[in-house]
Amino acid sequence: MRMPVLFVGHGSPMNAIEDNEWSRGFRSLSGLIPRPRAILMVSGHWYTNGTFITGNERPETIHDFYGFPRELFAVQYPAPGDVDLARQIRKLIGEDRSELSSEWGFDHGTWTVLRWMYPHADIPVIQLSINAKLTMAEHLDLAKSLAPLRDDGVLIMGSGNVTHNLRDLMRQMQTPDFSPPDWALNFDEAVKKAVTTRDRKSLIDLWPNGPGARQAHPTPDHFLPILYTAAAADPADQVRFPIEGFDRSFSMRSILYG
């Protein structure tokens, strides 16, 4: 069975421990897709100079944030890795263009979502880093090379946010106004249109040239997982948005292909 492709807007790390509309949305996602034999995650929180693939048998849970409650730092997501799958992914990308790494594990872009989707942590998970040195077109080509994994029971996932401006979020948290600003609404709508029409060129052009792009993403790390999942999808795949809405200026939109 061919697996779908999924992008998730992960939002605040607190979604990992709070019962809210976003965590309930994450929990519901697993019911929309067949159970995968493994998961390949592209998280906006592993942004590197080079292309790396986790090659650990037992990846650690990384708490890559600060200033949050102790309860959040206590969360563990003990899913196994899969070294053989990591090697297979490296071959698909190109062994001359990628490396296995044992220096990373599961960052919060991964485990804050997966602990709701698959709480037993019994599905192997591999993380793929986002290479900061690549052009948008090169990211697209790399992501396309991952598509055969779908026919091998692997769920390809991206985790970021359609809009992600931490400075603006912090500013907004000091005010009583929870409504998303116009630039966030406009960029979210542009992404929705590009993925619905399967217009990859328009999607690539959205950063940094789209409406409100520099406000939506001062840096591209949380935007690129959207591109990876769009590229791994097939033009014949149905496109759905199982989670929509805003947490202040963060778009929490999720995108399911297939």
What residue spans do the PLM features occupy?
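A short aromatic-anchored loop/beta-hairpin motif
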Residues: M1-R97
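Short, histidine-centered active-site or binding-site loop motifs used for metal coordination
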Residues: G9-S12, S129-A132, W207
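Beta-strand elements within well-structured catalytic alpha/beta cores of enzymes
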Residues: P4-V8, A38-S43, L128, L149-V162, ...
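Surface-exposed, charge/polar-rich loops and edge strands
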Residues: K91, P124, A132-L134, L140, ...
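Flexible, glycine/proline-enriched loop segments at strand-loop-helix junctions
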Residues: L72-P80, S102, S129-M136, A213
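Short, basic/glycine-rich phosphate-binding loops at helix/coil junctions
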Residues: L6-F7, D64-P69, Y118-I126, D205
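Short glycine-enriched loops at secondary-structure junctions
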Residues: G44-T48, R58-P59, F106-L114, V162-T163
